[in-house]
From Swiss-Prot:
Family to which the UniProt record says this protein belongs: Belongs to the UvrC family.
Record keyword Ribonucleoprotein present: no
Record protein name field: UvrABC system protein C
Domain GIY-YIG: 11-89
PANTHER family: UVRABC SYSTEM PROTEIN C, UVRC/OXIDOREDUCTASE
Length: 607
């Protein structure tokens, strides 16, 4: 993967994600400064094995800006839970994030801090700082006076009939304190959970009424206790781990433009948490107002996305009635009308500011790319023409590679670049049928087949190559030259050797090495790497089909279990990395079956 330009990356807190060629998220991380953090991935040579592996298979990196590093942690956690990135699972587990847990599975539930999920407990969080969480727990005990002791101490107190120390000083109203019943205590737990779930207004209102009543009755000590509880509740609310109220499910959309290009950013919020971030660029029409641009953007967004219940905006879009009618006509659920909100509350407005910041960042990034990409791509083509002494500009370049599976199933691949950009619709895959495992003979066969398909194509056609690149050295180049002579076509051909990035040309004994920082070398490396990626993708499909057939040979593994195994582990590399315990945990899989599966997968990896 080629790193993004440093100037494109904002110096803001945010969450970044690495994706593979299929768009699967491999890794999610957070940063106080995105530019510095992402830069460290591409400049630091001392990386761990897992990060190096992740970078080797990544094809894209993206990011989302947020208001601060605490919000970055929350969004990072939300996405790790949502997408289960494989590299995050291995590098960071849930113990990095402290939670609040209410042990509802116990007869007398308690509130505690945990870094691991507890069975039969309800969890709240994550929270960014454990020392803040300890303060929060102390405040919650002050408000709800629920049990804090361990199960052993609780049983001892019940057996002895003597409350624990917390109960004796009125800090705990557990049943062992002899001041409350089990039913009354369960009501306290219910109120605590409602408070943690965001239903805080009713509790605050109730406490205020009780405080005023106590003050009116001149019960000043009780009124002071209630006042302290109200202050404690308000402090806890200011530290809530919830991004928005859990009742909020909506799309938050912001649009910014430079009068020629509009950048649209959409945060999809479900149950108070950001689940997805979408970004687009639209061509802005001349003399188009901001409200008209907003309406046009919304229409185009929901041609691509499913419709939400609510859409939250900064401003009122033009033709609001017509826009609302259009969206509701598209809505499958006719019983539910889509609400367009353009007067957001304070909490929603803060999130919209974040959405707008991301839209501005993407617009700036797009502007930089738009101004530089065209110039650099054409500079690389002019450099290639100069260095390779070509008669014409190499507008269409084709690159060829040979791959095989353990010496069998030889195949060839062809990738095409036009004007310095990949043209994936022109990519081709060839099955090579020769008796011996011979890369040179395979390359000759591959090039012959490609050239014969060009015999009826005019040389001025856009489908006719101006330059052919062979992945390999002198032997592969000789095979390609032989194929050109066999078919009778004249197309410039060079071989690119990976060891020193050497270019070999027909009839020349010495290699050509392009300047190390030149755009022309960068383009050739990009073409060669794309050729490897495409060839590897095809071989991976064949390899996995072959290993699937191997799995069917294991006694006790039928079609249903093989499919179950492949659904759990997305690739056979994951099967090899999985432990026997992970595999045997699948329904219907025993330890012996898991051992046979591991043995099969590991034996296959050695072939």
């Amino acid at each position: 993967m080629y790193p993004p330009r440093r100037i494109e990356i904002p110096c803001k807190p945010g969450v970044y994600r690495f994706e593979d060629e299929n768009g699967r998220i491999l890794y999610v991380g957070k940063a106080k400064n995105l530019r510095n953090r992402l830069g460290s991935y591409f400049t630091n040579a001392r990386r761990g094995r897992r990060i190096s592996y992740m970078l080797s298979i990544s094809k894209k990196v993206g990011w989302t800006c947020v208001a601060d590093d605490i919000e970055a942690l929350r969004l990072e956690y939300s996405w790790i839970k949502e997408f289960a990135p494989p590299c995050n699972v291995k590098l960071k587990d849930d113990k990095a994030y402290p939670f609040l847990a209410v042990t509802i599975g116990e007869q007398v539930p308690r509130l505690l801090i945990t870094r691991r999920k507890i069975q039969y407990a309800t969890h709240f969080g994550p929270y960014p700082k454990v020392f803040h969480l300890r303060e929060t727990v102390s405040l919650l005990h002050k408000i709800f006076q629920i049990r804090t002791c361990s199960p052993t101490n609780y049983k001892r107190a019940i057996a002895s009939g003597m409350p624990c120390f917390e109960g004796q000083i009125n800090k705990c109203f557990g049943p062992c304190s002899l001041k409350t019943t089990h039913l009354q205590y369960q009501k306290r737990i219910k109120n605590l959970m409602a408070f943690l779930e965001g239903q805080s207004s009713s509790l605050l209102e109730s406490l205020k009424k009780k405080m005023l009543k106590a003050s009116k009755n001149k019960e000043y000590e009780e009124a002071a206790i209630l006042r302290d509880k109200i202050q404690a509740a308000q402090t806890v609310l200011s530290r809530s781990a919830v991004l928005l109220d859990e009742t909020v499910s909506a799309d938050f959309i912001a649009v910014v433009s430079d009068n020629s290009i509009a950048s649209v950013q959409c945060f999809r919020v479900i149950a108070g948490r950001i689940k997805s971030v979408y970004s687009w660029h639209f061509e802005q029409q001349e003399d188009q107002s901001a409200s008209e641009l907003l309406s046009q953007s919304i229409i185009q967004v929901y041609d691509k996305l499913s419709l939400p219940k609510r859409i939250v905006l900064f401003d009122k879009p033009s033709y609001l009635s017509a826009l609302s009618a259009h969206l509701n006509d598209k809505n499958i659920d006719r019983s539910l009308e889509i609400e367009i909100v353009y007067h957001p509350n304070e909490q929603e407005r803060r999130l919209l500011e974040t959405v707008k910041d991301n839209a501005l960042s993407e617009l700036e990034r797009h502007r930089l790319r738009r101004s530089s990409d065209y110039t650099e791509r054409h500079r690389s083509l002019f450099e290639l023409q100069k260095y390779l002494n070509l008669n014409s500009l190499p507008v269409r370049i084709e690159c060829f590679d040979i791959s095989h599976l353990s010496g069998t199933n030889t195949s060839g691949s062809m990738v095409v670049f036009e004007n310095g950009e990949p043209k994936k619709s022109a990519y081709r895959h060839f099955n090579i049928h020769i008796d011996q495992n011979n890369d040179t003979a395979s390359m000759f066969s591959l090039i012959c087949r490609r050239l014969r398909s060009l015999e009826s194509v005019a040389q001025d056609s856009p489908d006719y190559p101006h330059l052919m690149i062979i992945d390999g050295g002198k032997p592969q180049l000789s095979a390609a030259v032989g194929a050109l002579q066999e078919v009778g076509l004249k197309i410039p051909v060079f071989a690119l050797s990976k060891r020193l990035e050497e270019l070999w040309s027909p009839g020349v004994k010495t290699s050509l090495i392009l300047p190390p920082n030149s755009e022309s070398l960068f383009l050739l490396q990009k073409i060669r790497d794309e050729s490897h990626r495409f060839a590897l993708k095809q071989q991976t499909r064949r390899r996995e089909a072959y290993l699937t057939s191997e799995l069917f040979r294991i006694p006790g593994l039928g079609k249903q279990k093989v499919m179950q195994l492949l659904r759990r582990f997305s690739s056979f590399a994951e099967i090899r990395q999985a432990s026997i315990e992970d595999i045997s945990a699948l329904p219907g899989f025993g330890v012996k079956t898991a051992e046979k599966i591991k043995e099969c997968a590991e034996a296959f990896s050695l072939k």
